């Protein structure tokens, strides 16, 4: 499979593929954060919740499997042994799947400056963030 080399559609397709893979395994409370102006490590962070460590591992497995099928490179995975917080590194996107208590404790959305005021500034600079199915919170 060849991927579209246009950077914006490449990233958009990748984001949608990640969200679909998360939703396939009933991951929830999905946030997509554009962090391009905050770090050079990645373009987007996607944070999602899972009801248990077992589900978090299953969501991470599905993200890897579905994106690999579509031809995207998987750089690495961390946290699968414990499962409270599983990270999937796709280079352009870093995916964090957490159980709710871990997510609340680390609060990555706030840590990365995606507070309401920051979200508004990022969205006005980059255009309104899109949500795939209406229940994704753009950050």
Where are these regions (language model features)?
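Compact, glycine-rich, soluble single-domain proteins
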Residues: 55-72, 87
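Long, contiguous binding/interaction regions
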Residues: 1-37, 51-58, 65, 79, ...
């Amino acid at each position: 499979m060849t991927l579209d080399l246009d950077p914006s559609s490449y990233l958009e397709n990748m984001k949608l593929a990640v969200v679909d893979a998360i939703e396939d395994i009933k991951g929830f409370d999905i946030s997509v954060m554009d962090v391009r102006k905050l770090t050079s490590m990645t373009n987007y962070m996607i944070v999602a919740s899972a009801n248990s460590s077992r589900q978090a591992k299953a969501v991470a497995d599905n993200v890897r499997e579905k994106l690999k099928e579509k031809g995207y490179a998987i750089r690495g995975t961390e946290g699968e042994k414990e499962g409270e917080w599983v990270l999937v590194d796709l280079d352009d996107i870093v995916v964090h799947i957490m159980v709710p208590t871990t997510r609340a404790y680390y609060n990555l959305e706030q840590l990365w400056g995606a507070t309401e005021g920051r979200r508004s500034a990022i969205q006005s600079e980059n255009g309104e963030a899109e949500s795939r199915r209406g229940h994704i919170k753009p950050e």
